[in-house]
Design a protein with these regions (language model features):
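EAL-family c-di-GMP phosphodiesterase catalytic domain
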Residues: 6-14, 65-67, 94-102, 119-218
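A broad detector of the eukaryotic-type serine/threonine protein kinase catalytic domain
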Residues: 23-31, 115, 164, 168
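Distinct, well-ordered alpha-helical segments
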Residues: 50, 69-82, 102-110, 130-143
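Alpha-helical scaffolding segments of alpha/beta enzyme cores, especially the outer helices
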Residues: 44, 75-79, 106-116, 134, ...
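Metal-dependent enolase-superfamily TIM-barrel catalytic cores that perform enediolate-based chemistry
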Residues: 38-40, 92, 111-117
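Bacterial c-di-GMP phosphodiesterase EAL domain
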Residues: 1-85
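Short acidic capping loops at alpha-helix termini that bridge into adjacent secondary structure
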Residues: 87-91
Length: 218
């Protein structure tokens, strides 16, 4: 979200964008610190929603490439949750399926530690043919975002429909076609990881949308 970035010195009213920090994202030595920065800002957003007594299923963070090859920063995470008491289940971190399939023993241990400590990981780009449902459950994953190339498949429809009963939440990406949305709804998919129209939203946009929703339900 644009409002998650800071101001720019000497340019009053301007805010940093993803393009401004792109060079930093390419520095692998900053992956851990940048990831924690995004996590902190997402936690702050959830706390703001909580203080406004607004309901939201959570905030999904697309984690930086290489995040899971870093040493676990669970101690920092735990301290963060102590400072800002929120439900950890509402912070959802993406875990690319390709990362798991190519992970060495050390990386798998880091992933396992996050899951065991209540960090909610979403298996991104999930393909049931190369990563069966049983393997998802064995890993302890409770959320998946399917590979869009599998949409409209009759075989995959049966697999998706069975996941809610197994305690696994399925997320759409928010940029699907109307046909894909109808198919996903028929497969019992009711969560979208992003705005339905696919545009960027600031923190204030999210709060405003939740306030309007709360007013409609009053």
């Amino acid at each position: 979200a644009e409002s998650w970035f800071g101001g720019i010195a000497g340019r009053e009213g301007d805010r940093e964008t993803a393009a401004d920090i792109e060079p930093l994202l390419k520095r692998t030595d900053l992956v851990a610190d940048m990831s924690f920065y995004f996590l902190y800002e997402a936690t702050d957003l959830l706390l703001r929603e909580q203080n406004c007594k607004l309901e939201n299923d959570g905030v999904l963070l697309n984690m930086l490439p290489g995040f899971y090859s870093q040493q676990s920063h669970l101690q920092r995470f735990t301290k963060l949750f102590e400072d800002q008491p929120i439900n950890k289940e509402k912070l959802i971190l993406t875990l690319p399926q390709s990362t798991v399939l190519s992970a060495n023993k050390a990386t798998l241990e880091v992933i396992s530690r996050y899951i065991k400590n209540g960090i909610n990981l979403l298996l991104d780009g999930w393909d049931y043919r190369s990563f069966p449902v049983d393997k998802v459950r064995e890993l302890g994953i409770k959320a998946v975002r399917p590979d869009p190339s599998l949409y409209l498949s009759a075989d995959f429809a049966g697999v998706l429909s069975s996941l809610p009963d197994l305690g696994i939440t399925v997320y759409a990406a928010g940029t699907e076609t109307s046909d894909a949305f109808r198919w996903l709804a028929a497969c019992k998919v009711s969560h979208i990881a992003g705005p339905i129209c696919g545009h960027e939203m600031t923190e204030d946009d999210i709060i405003r949308e939740l306030l309007l929703k709360d007013r409609e339900n009053a």
